[in-house]
């Protein structure tokens, strides 16, 4: 087994094999790995925090993997070291990591200045979020100065990612009629920059029109006194056009946050939110593994299914039993 000093030294020196092993360690849900993982993160924390953290989401069919491949390759060409992480709670259903996106990022996958990590399988959105947050610490300590966090799954994954990044990029497509069609409710409110992808060939003009219309809608949504109104740009990941402007707007947004003290405040609040998220996740883990709860739960679930007991009363009885359990928690 690799000791703490070897992990810390390997990560700080950017040794890919040890960086990968370190991320596997912090992703692990095994009890025997938890103590070492937290010691490692504590040692790496002072060496993290300097990267530009960008969340990326997109409507179905937007070409997100192609965009990240082109965007990340542009950044490594500019001298940056890029890490790509994914938040995909749906991957736990199949019991394996999402590898498809990594194989579609053909340039980044072989770029020595890039590190692409598929989504961990942690069983819950909270588990995946924890693993991704801790992976950010590892990647930053390894010298990656740009971290791209991709949302792959459904549900609340966009909100989870927005809670761990500095700026949030939404990728969308030119559409006939309502330009908001296909964009999940609530995601627009999270976006700091919007990019209309596939602005190439016969779709270039359509994309530019869509960008103008969406920009107007966002101005109405945010109001004239907003601290930041998300710019809407058009780009083509396939032709690598417009990507430099997307980067410029994202870095401008981050610089504005930094200059007003909001970046520090945002990251501090993210850490506090993370703390309480971990409290909820750990309480649920302890509750589910409590022997008394494991004995009682099937009985109560059966009664709830039969309509003999309300969900509220069942929950109260589970919590009562959990609170009465003697001895140390598992």
What are these regions (language model features)?
Residues 2, 6, 13, 42, ...:
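Expand to "…catalyze enediolate/carbanion chemistry for C-C bond making/breaking, isomerization
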Residues 2-13, 17-62, 68-157, 164-171, ...:
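Nucleotide-state-sensitive switch-loop elements of NTP-binding domains
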Residues 19-21, 234, 245-323:
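Long, well-ordered amphipathic alpha-helical subdomains in the mid-to-C-terminal portions
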Residues 85, 171, 196-197, 235:
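Generic beta-sheet signal
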Residues 98, 135, 160, 164, ...:
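Alpha-helical scaffold elements adjacent to nucleotide-binding pockets in ATP/GTP-utilizing enzyme cores
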Residues 176-205:
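Flexible active-site lid/hinge loop adjacent to a nucleotide/diphosphate
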Residues 193, 199-256:
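Canonical P-loop GTPase G-domain recognition
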Residues 322-330:
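Generic C-terminal helix-cap and adjacent flexible tail
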